[in-house]
Structures are given as C-alpha cells and as structure tokens.
Amino acid sequence: MEEDLFQLRQLPVVKFCRTGESARSEDDTASGEHEVQIEGVRVGLEAVELDDGAAVPKEFANPTDDTFMVEDAVEAIGFGKFQWKLSVLTGLAWMADAMEMMILSILAPQLHCEWRLPSWQVALLTSVVFVGMMSSSTLWGNISDQYGRKTGLKISVLWTLYYGILSAFAPVYSWILVLRGLVGFGIGGVPQSVTLYAEFLPMKARAKCILLIEVFWAIGTVFEVVLAVFVMPSLGWRWLLILSAVPLLLFAVLCFWLPESARYDVLSGNQEKAIATLKRIATENGAPMPLGKLIISRQEDRGKMRDLFTPHFRWTTLLLWFIWFSNAFSYYGLVLLTTELFQAGDVCGISSRKKAVEAKCSLACEYLSEEDYMDLLWTTLSEFPGVLVTLWIIDRLGRKKTMALCFVIFSFCSLLLFICVGRNVLTLLLFIARAFISGGFQAAYVYTPEVYPTATRALGLGTCSGMARVGALITPFIAQVMLESSVYLTLAVYSGCCLLAALASCFLPIETKGRGLQESSHREWGQEMVGRGMHGADVTRSNSGSQE
C-alpha cells in the first residue's frame, strides 16, 4: 500500500489510533520515528520537539497528559467574586447604552417644541444616532477581534462619554444632529461588553449571567425616566444629557481593573498572558487552577467577514441579521410610539386615536406632562419582568424557541391596539409588548456570542448589532412620521415584522442550549485526518477493485 509522508514542524509527534485517540510509547520516543494508523493506512511521521513552555495545540495533545483549554479552566474555576465584579463593570457600560437610547424618546418632544422642529427633523434626530451606531458596529467588532475586547470596549466608551457631554452644549439643531451622530458611533461598540463578559462565564451559568447584564439595561432605562422627571422641569434637557453620562464616567474610572479575554489572548498567541489572567480569576474566586499545559485550538485567521458566510454559518448569519433588525426596529419603535400615544391622550377607537395623534404630532406641540412621564415609567419598568421571564424560559425552551415566543407575543399585543382601548388598557398592552420584545433582545444577546467561534465572535456580534441599528434607523420614520398618516398601517408593520422574525428564529440551524463556547470553526485536526485517511483508504480499495 502506498505510504504518504507528512512533515510536522514544531508539533509533538503522537500515534493516532483508529478511533481517533492518541497514544505515545517509550519505543516511539526512543526511535524518533512514529506511525499514524488510520483504517490500515500507515503514514510515517518525523518527530520534532516543542520549545520549552510552548503551548500544545489541542489537536496534537496527548489525552493522557495533564492539559487543559481556556474553556476547561473557566469551567473548573466557576462563577465567583471575579464574575460578580465583571458583571457590575460591564453592566455600567450597558446601563449607559440604555440611557443614551431612552433619552431619545424624551429629547425628541422637548426639542420639537423648544426649537419648533417639524416631525421629519425630530425623526432625523433619532435616526442619526442609529446611523452612527450602524456605521461603527462592524468596525468595533473588527477592532475587538484584532486588538482585544478590552481595547475596543474602552475606546468606544470614552468616545461616547466625550461626545455625549459635548452634545449638551449644542447651540443649534445642526450641531446637536452631528454630535448625537458621533455619540451613536461610540455606542456601536458597547455591545462588545457582552462578548468580553461571555468569554469569562462557565457554560451552565452563561445564559443567566448574560441576562444579568440585561438587568443593567432595564435599570438604565428606568433611571433615565426618573432622572428626566426631576431634571427636565427645573434644569432642562442640557443637564439631562450631562447627567446621563455618569455611568460612562464611572466605567472610564474603573476600567483599569478590566482584564483582557483569555480566549482572545490564546488566539493571539499570548498564552502566558492568558494563564496569568486565569490564575487571577482562580485566586479571586478561591478556586483551584487546572494543572498541566494550556492547549490551543487550531490557529486560524481572525475577524474576517467571509468567515461569517462559510457553509456552516451562512444561514445562521443571514437569519440572525434579520432577527436583530426586527428586534431593534420593533423595540425602539415601541419606545417612540409610547410617548406619541400617551401624548394623544385617553382615546377609544382607532379613528379617534389617529386624529388625536395627528393633532399632537403637528407643529402645535405639547411638552410631556407629569402623567406622560409616569406612564412612560410604568412601561419602562416592564424591562424587569421581561428579564425574569426570559431567564426562566431560555434554558427550558432553548434560545430559538424563546426568541420566537417573544416575537409572537409582541405581535399579538400590537394587533390588540387595533381595538377600542382606554389609556389604562393601552398602558398594560404597551407594558406586555415591551416586556417581551426586550426579552427577545436578551435572548438574541445570549444566542449570538454562543453560536460563533472565538475567532469571529466579536465580528459576528458586531455585524448583528449593525443590522439592529439599521432597524433602529428606519423606525423613527414609522413611529413618528407614518403614525401621522395611519395608525393601522404603523401597527401592522411592527406586528408583521415580528411574525417574520419569529419564523426566522425557528429556522435557525443551530441551537446553542447546553453547548460550550466554540474555540474554532473547524473540526478537530485529528478528526479531519481520520476522515481523510478513511476516504483515502476507500479510494485505494476502489482502485484495487477496478484493477482486478
């Protein structure tokens, strides 16, 4: 039988058994010549020693040795003091993101009246923030994959802090339009906090812990409304913008403690730094560090857009893009619709609601009243039960079904707004709808980092976040401009979009429930070799048969 010769450089030489397991004998080590036995195929290998202290690639690691991967270390160390600190720190960035988003629904009617802006300019003020977010999301994902999760997150937060405070001093509409767009550019990188956070979490706690960060989003939205209740009547919107940057300032002060992702360090070839980070976590948690050598997955390129469209991930990427688009489109649309519908007053019947909304959306504007703020606060509080419901069902139903359920319930509540309802029922329906659309967002933030491997995790999340910003960019023209023409059509657009998103969730090819974070998009090298060896053996047999 023909023998194939393989030259392996800087890799330990092992004997691959037929089952894919490896074994190393003293005779092999002494002779320096080794064999790979795969379905009767004998392949000669040349032994090459590793440098002292070098990390052993996973595909060539001897399972009888004491070796571990980052995933093994994170699982062994578990959830403890370190993760609680990390939760609070990354949660501050998440809280700030929520406040910057929530402020749009408060700032828009205020400037509409104060600067006598037409409806399209009010909508543009909201959209420009999402233009900035959309244009930067992929950029921040690339930065995080190339230079580190910590680096990308720090730069984006400091950028947002600077332009957020500067926008409070905008003298005219054009200035605040540009400055809020730059704020949006910085906010596009804040979702990378989820990537960093997820890579330090053990598998069993990952979904619950990522949802824990979502609690900070809920806190941020509620805090923004409460802040507006006290600040707007006395100090005005400029002080509201300044005070809304406080969580970003706290993050900037405390970020020196934030570690770089150990998974990223391993992928970058910084094994010593990764081990130091893991030892730090083990010390803080009071847990033992795994013994042995750190092993790494197959080295591959990082942060390449084409990796999101390989046959394995193509449909996942496209479906996730639509899911994120629909989620942001509906979530931010509901946030903007809430203030518009509350300003319309206590209405009964679609036709009367339409007239009321048209009156309130005209240039004869009206500032948000105390009652409007209180109702806005009630609907904002729905973020908390949304987190709790998602937390309860996501590990029972799985990620895909959770997203689908949230989209369906939001769509149903949107359709109920077609019938005659009073202000109290309107508030209740908006409360339920917001709880579940925020739950869908939370489930997407759990699913997306889990489905992509380490090499493209930040880029995958960044592109999904970018598609979400496209939806958020469009939604002001539906919730604030189209609403003037047709309440029916506006509600139908949001309801239909979420029904399609529910279907997209069901068609996702991968369910990540109970699955560890993937280090590589490739199969293990040994498995690939077994596949090739078996294929080669089959070919040899078939050729022999044909010759006979």
Swiss-Prot record:
It comes from the Eukaryota. Keywords: Cytoplasmic vesicle, Membrane, Phosphoprotein, Synapse, Transmembrane, Transmembrane helix, Transport. Gene3D superfamilies: MFS general substrate transporter like domains (1.20.1250.20). GO terms for cellular component: basal plasma membrane; synaptic vesicle membrane. GO terms for molecular function: transmembrane transporter activity. The chain crosses the membrane at residues 88-108, 123-143, 157-177, 181-201, 210-230, 239-259, 317-337, 374-394, 402-422, 425-445, 458-478, 490-510. It is found in: Cytoplasmic vesicle, Secretory vesicle, Synaptic vesicle membrane. Residues 1-87, 144-156, 202-209, 260-316, 395-401, 446-457, 511-548 are cytoplasmic. The modification Phosphoserine is found at residues 25, 31, 542. GO terms for biological process: xenobiotic transport. Residues 109-122, 178-180, 231-238, 338-373, 423-424, 479-489 are vesicular. It is a multi-pass membrane protein. Coiled coil: none annotated. The keyword Ribonucleoprotein does not apply. Pfam families: MFS_1 (PF07690), Sugar_tr (PF00083). InterPro entries: MFS (IPR011701), MFS_dom (IPR020846), MFS_sugar_transport-like (IPR005828), MFS_trans_sf (IPR036259), Orgcat_transp/SVOP (IPR004749), SVOP-like_MFS_dom (IPR047969). Belongs to the major facilitator superfamily. This is Synaptic vesicle 2-related protein. The gene is SVOP.
